[in-house]
Amino acid sequence: VVLLSHLGIRYDEQIAETYPQVNLIIGSHTHHLFEEGKLINETYLAAADRYGYYIGCIDLTVEDGQLRECQIVAIPTKTYLLDLDKEDQVFIQAMREEGYRRLAQEKVADLGRKLSFEETCQVVLEAVCQETDSQLTVLNTGLIMKTLGPQVTMADLQEALPHQMRMARLVVTGQELKEICQEVFTKAELLRNQTIKGMGFRGKTFGQVITGNFAYKNGNLLYNGRVVDSHEKFSLVLVDQYYYAAYFPTIKEKDATLLFPDLLRELVAKYLRKNGANWDKG
């Protein structure tokens, strides 16, 4: 049994430990490298990094329907030593400039002034709640790469929110929300200055945790100026990264509805088209 996996190394290793009937797992998530493969119990794992830096070679010896031998090697290609073709450079730059030009022509809103970073964060918080019809949200400031205004185009939103992220909505009780916040705020202190890669994130560091339409202070949840009842139910929307990543197991345990088709920046664009300079008047 050969498994081509896009799940990532953590799940590949878990499968190898749990399902001995899987003979070989070929890691196609391209975030890790096994130069000579890896053997967990009776399962072989192969992975050849990313960007064509390695070519993976797997030789299997099968007799009478049984795997007798498996040889794995990742061969370095040293593509980083190659010069980029001049014509390729010109083509890539032309495509990048054309893409930016088209996005810059797509006007979204006139905010009347340049927003501060805190105001830009507030716009994003309000946008994801309103455009996903959710009561609450939790985000991190590392998602916001630049401030907005006075004029906002899709090029601005591409620069401010470059992430390939959609939203995930959960329905939680007040008690479950408190447990999520306890975990998120505690781990956020460790993640704050950590460089984050993968899962659609195109920023630099995680940043601070910010909340929309509620507050979490001293272990208490405040919603509409009152302490939240533990049995009260809320719709909570998050970027899908929180659901997929290993940072917050409390979130991963919940049933989540992944919201399609809009990316984070597209939700903000919809919100600003409706509200414009009146975004803070609601």
Which functions belong to the PLM regions below?
Residues 23, 133-135, 234:
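Conserved acidic residues
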Residues 1-11, 108:
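Short acidic, glycine-rich surface-loop motifs adjacent to enzyme active sites
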Residues 2, 25, 60, 128, ...:
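Divalent metal-coordination and catalytic microenvironments
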Residues 62-152, 158-160, 270-282:
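A short C-terminal boundary segment appended to hydrolase-like catalytic domains
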Residues 1-4, 24-27, 46, 136-139, ...:
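Structural recognition of the beta-strand scaffold that forms the well-ordered cores
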Residues 12-102, 188:
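Active-site-adjacent helix-turn-beta-strand microarchitecture at beta-sheet edges
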Residues 5-8, 28-31, 49-50, 141-143, ...:
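Active-site metal-binding loops of divalent metal-dependent hydrolases
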Residues 143-282:
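Feature captures C-terminal
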